[in-house]
Design a protein with these regions (language model features):
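DNA-processing P-loop NTPase/helicase core
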Residues: 97-131
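P-loop NTPase Walker
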Residues: 1-106
Length: 131
């Protein structure tokens, strides 16, 4: 499959840009995820960039899984070593790996919205504050 075949001119320009960060600003449904997946596949297949030298981040777990599937489909193989995840999971992974280098307890927990609400309610209860 030709990685560039289904892309328009602007998308091709972003996909084939020199290796390094690329900023793509576009509205919903304009093909940003398509550009990101095609760029990852292009860099690996055409420029022999190693997967462990790249990272693709998005906002949802569903989108991250879809990106992985699309990249694998474009390349016709499973891509090992490529980091694809949400902003939160990717940053949490970096923190877990690098926590030894900063003054942070390595057993920290990242709270989601439900966890945060539960803690605030517990604190208010502990302070005898009526809602």
């Amino acid at each position: 499959m030709d990685i560039l075949q289904s892309l328009n001119g602007r998308q091709k320009k972003a996909v084939t840009a020199s290796p390094g960060p690329v900023l793509v600003l576009a509205g919903p449904g304009s093909g940003k995820t398509r550009v990101l997946t095609h760029r990852a596949a292009y860099l690996m297949s055409e420029l022999q960039v190693q997967p462990f030298h790249m990272m693709a981040v998005t906002f949802t777990n569903k989108a991250a899984e879809e990106m992985k599937k699309r990249i694998d489909a474009l390349l016709g193989r499973h891509t090992r070593g490529l980091t694809v995840g949400t902003f939160h999971s990717t940053c949490a992974g970096i923190l877990r790996i690098e926590a030894a280098h900063i003054p942070v307890n390595q057993n920290y927990v990242i709270f989601d919205a439900d966890d945060q609400l539960r803690v605030v309610k517990q604190v208010l209860k502990d302070l005898n504050y009526n809602e």
